[in-house]
Design a protein with these regions (language model features):
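Transmembrane helix-loop-helix hairpins at lipid-water interfaces of multipass membrane proteins
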Residues: 17-78, 163, 274-281
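Primarily ABC-family ATPase nucleotide-binding module
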Residues: 325-368
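Transmembrane helices of ABC transporter permease
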Residues: 18, 22, 26-32, 142-192, ...
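An intracellular "coupling" helix at the cytosolic face of ABC transporter transmembrane type-1 domains
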Residues: 15-20, 110, 127-136, 140, ...
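Juxtamembrane helix-loop junctions of ABC transporter transmembrane domains
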Residues: 4, 40, 44, 71-114, ...
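Cytosolic ends of transmembrane helices, especially the final helix of ABC transmembrane type-1 domains
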Residues: 219, 243-246, 295-324
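Hydrophobic alpha-helical segments in the permease module
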Residues: 64-79, 249, 281-306
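Membrane-integrated ABC transporters
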Residues: 1-36, 61-63, 86, 131, ...
């Protein structure tokens, strides 16, 4: 079994190719929505500036309002398209993984002493494969958005107001840095939770199959107590993972709120002439655009933080699969189609056939 977590990350990377075009749609649709978001915020700020500062009548503002509504509808459509495509890609990848694992199980000899128990193998194929679902459907699109959109938004804002641009570019990296620190502890807790889930699933399945034997030997109460103990261990490990997730999300929200509050404070103090850091007056149009974009710069990072533990869950699931069934095949082995032979039947004659048990202690057929 591979002990290095980097190998698990490489395997997740290789599995992406099985997502097909749907995965590309899931990755690119949110980026297109981010580009439209800038256009929408700029148009909304322009409409507000014209209405408040310019005093233009509502009839002249209706084209801008219509454009804003149209952009909202298109962005909602792109969001739904990306989400559905992510689910389709994840299902395709899980199907490929299960085919590969079934192939590995069929290739194993029934006499293999190292083979996993049937309950553990079933848990690996069902539960642990399911653990990669949200990695491809949610985490990967969120990671791409977090890597690109804040930088693009910051680059757009920087020429308009260098103070706001610098504030964004300084505060935004604090969130990924903290996520990396939290991720170390989260990965360990998630690995333990995956092992506890696999142990409980395998134990319950095996005991269920041997229920009659357990009752005959009067062991049903002892095994029930053992399953209760395993369930309690899983509950504690799951709560540990959830506590780390909630704590990290709270701290990340704190950093994001500080960034948004800093922009709001800067814009407000500039408007009332308490700050004079700009070379030119701050217009209402630009000020509203900065306020509208402030939460949007942190949204991709917050989205990544909310799905960051899906990455740890996927890695833990792959490690558990490897521990129970061995290294995952990159591609399932395609079994050739077996067509019935045409023509006359073939006869086979065996003389003096002897058949013994594998330990050669008993003779089943002698000299037939």
């Amino acid at each position: 079994m591979t002990q290095n977590k980097q190998e698990t990350g490489k395997l997740l990377g290789r599995l992406r190719i099985h997502g097909g075009p749907a995965l590309w749609v899931a990755l690119l649709a949110p980026l297109a929505g981010g580009a439209l978001l800038v256009w929408q915020a700029w148009t909304l700020a322009e409409v507000l500036g014209q209405a408040i500062e310019g005093g233009q009548p509502s009839a002249l503002l209706m084209p801008g309002v219509g454009l804003i509504l149209g952009l909202l509808v298109v962005r909602a459509g792109l969001g739904a398209l990306g989400e559905q495509a992510g689910l389709i890609a994840a299902e395709a990848i899980k199907r490929q993984m299960r085919q590969a694992l079934f192939t590995r199980l069929l290739d194993r000899s029934p006499r293999d002493a190292n083979a996993a128990a049937s309950g553990l193998a079933a848990a690996a194929i069902v539960d642990q494969v399911e653990a990669v679902d949200l990695y491809f459907a949610r985490y990967l699109p969120a990671a791409l958005q977090a890597a690109l959109l804040p930088l693009v938004f910051g680059a757009i804002i920087l020429p308009l107001d260098w103070v706001a641009g610098v504030l964004f570019l300084v505060t935004a990296p604090l969130i990924p840095i903290f996520m990396a620190l939290v991720g170390w502890g989260a990965q360990i807790a998630t690995d333990r939770q995956a092992r506890a889930l696999s142990h409980l699933s395998g134990r319950f399945s095996d005991r269920l199959k041997g229920l009659l034997t357990l009752k005959l030997f009067g062991r049903e109460e002892a095994e029930t107590a053992g399953i209760v103990e395993a369930s309690e261990a899983l509950r504690k490990r799951t709560l540990k993972v959830l506590s780390i997730a909630f704590l990290s999300s709270a701290v990340l929200e704190f950093f994001a709120a500080l960034g948004v509050a800093g922009i709001a404070l800067y814009v407000g103090l500039t408007f009332i002439d308490y700050l004079h850091l700009r070379g030119s007056p701050l217009t209402l149009h630009v000020g509203m655009f900065l306020l509208l974009m402030a939460p949007e710069i942190y949204n991709p990072l917050r989205l990544l933080a909310s799905h960051y533990h899906d990455r740890a869950t996927a890695k833990a699931g792959l490690l558990e699969i490897e521990r129970q069934l061995g290294a995952l095949l990159d591609k399932p082995v395609e079994l050739a189609d077996i067509a019935p032979r045409s023509g006359p039947a073939i006869g086979v004659t065996l003389n003096t056939l002897t058949l013994r048990t594998p330990d050669r202690m008993r003779t089943i057929l002698d000299g037939a």
